[in-house]
């Protein structure tokens, strides 16, 4: 192939790749969601009977704080304050009963 033809074929290919890369951002899809804390605000407690599962994320490179995320029976997720005595009791009860995600 001639060099001029080759560069004419490259331009549409590069444009297509650029469009594909930006379309993911345009749809609002999360990009690298795990690279930051998930809990921006926390609650001091929630009633144990409303919790379906519990996820405890230790501190790491993504977030310097321990995060406790409760999935409620109505499907909502709630960030709980891991320092709150009520939350610590909930975590201990869930660990003992084995209902941990």
UniProtKB/Swiss-Prot annotation:
GO MF terms held by the record: chemokine activity; growth factor activity
Superkingdom, natural source: Eukaryota
InterPro entries xref list: Chemokine_b/g/d (IPR039809), Chemokine_CXC (IPR001089), Chemokine_CXC_CS (IPR018048), Chemokine_IL8-like_dom (IPR001811), CXC_Chemokine_domain (IPR033899), Interleukin_8-like_sf (IPR036048)
SMART domains, per the entry: SCY
Intrachain disulfide bonds: 37-63, 39-79
CDD domains: Chemokine_CXC (cd00273)
Pfam entry (one): IL8
Single biological process term from Gene Ontology: immune response
Compartments it resides in: Secreted
Cross-referenced Gene3D superfamilies: 2.40.50.40
Keywords annotated in UniProt: Cytokine, Disulfide bond, Growth factor, Inflammatory response, Secreted, Signal
Function text: Has chemotactic activity for neutrophils.
Similarity comment: family membership: Belongs to the intercrine alpha (chemokine CxC) family.
Name assigned to this protein: Growth-regulated alpha protein
Organism: Cricetulus griseus (Chinese hamster)
